[in-house]
Amino acid sequence: MDIIFYHPTFDTPYWINALTAALPGARVREWKRGDNEHADYALVWHPPVEMLQGRDLKAVFALGAGVDSILSKLKAHPEMLPEHIPLFRLEDTGMGQQMQEYAVSQVLHWFRRFDDYQALKQKSHWEPLADYQREDFTIGILGAGVLGSKVAEALAPWGFPLRCWSRSRKTYPGVQSFAGADELPAFLKGTRVLINLLPNTAETVGIINKGLLNQLADESYLMNLARGVHVIEEDLIDALNTGKLKGAMLDVYSSEPLPVESPLWAHPRVAMTPHIAAVTRPAEAVAYIARTIEHLEQGKAATRQVNRQLGY
């Protein structure tokens, strides 16, 4: 069994050694330009077209939760990865716990008004503020897939009203479920904290815009943990400036790294991290990939295959 590996920033020797240990007998090599030798499987992140084109692969694994970089290239180069070759993605592999940590810590930061106290500190002003009430602090999760369900699970013990919205209906204990475009307004109405965990598809690009933000509760909060293209940043800034939004926590941006001239850097109501909310944990990812390859070699069903029409 031959496996080719390509990731522009990962520790390639670690991955090759770990995969070799997890799949005895497998020959794992780093793909470099000009390598047209046989391969059964490809593990990739933002792969060049020539890496996959013309190969009779058994499967391709995207080394992250998103596959938009591959699917966007397929629009221009459909021969890069024919339909009969399955494409898999990493839905969790440690990312779920990281998303839980990020979301819970930020929700509590806002709920306890630490953002307001930090602003008062900048003015050297001492003033105890009125507490927020849990029943008025409804949390809405856009995207109810694996990561969305993990975030809802972590928030449940804190007693906030929880709701989720997705393309097709998902049901989780203690979470009010909304689905489809017709139910989006009802989901947004009264939502105080909006957490975005949507996949990046043609339908979700620009979904968080002026029209959507205006349907949230007054003085609401936005946490974007999915993709920067989901948010129209000009509309976000307008909502912050008018007070419709009280704050935003952003991990992803329309352009990364975020340009130094972006007004997001200096906005007092915007907190930011550099796309680190959930990163691939190598050991867990290797275990999942090895297990999936073993299932495929044995003719068994494998989970987390991407539906190319849906984009996830």
UniProtKB/Swiss-Prot annotation:
Gene name of this polypeptide: ghrA
Judged by the first EC level, this protein's enzyme class is oxidoreductase
Subcellular location(s): the record lists: Cytoplasm
Could you tell me what this protein is called?
Answer: Glyoxylate/hydroxypyruvate reductase A
Catalytic activity entry: glycolate + NADP(+) = glyoxylate + NADPH + H(+); (R)-glycerate + NAD(+) = 3-hydroxypyruvate + NADH + H(+); (R)-glycerate + NADP(+) = 3-hydroxypyruvate + NADPH + H(+)
The cross-references to SUPFAM superfamilies, in alphabetical order and at most eight, read: NAD(P)-binding Rossmann-fold domains
Q: Give the GO molecular function terms.
A: glyoxylate reductase (NADPH) activity; hydroxypyruvate reductase (NADH) activity; hydroxypyruvate reductase (NADPH) activity; NAD binding
Q: What does this protein do?
A: Catalyzes the NADPH-dependent reduction of glyoxylate and hydroxypyruvate into glycolate and glycerate, respectively.
* Disulfide topology: none
Q: Which family does it belong to?
A: Belongs to the D-isomer specific 2-hydroxyacid dehydrogenase family. GhrA subfamily.
| UniProt entry keywords in alphabetical sequence | Cytoplasm, NAD, NADP, Oxidoreductase
Q: What is its main location?
A: cytoplasm
**Active site, UniProt feature:** 227, 275
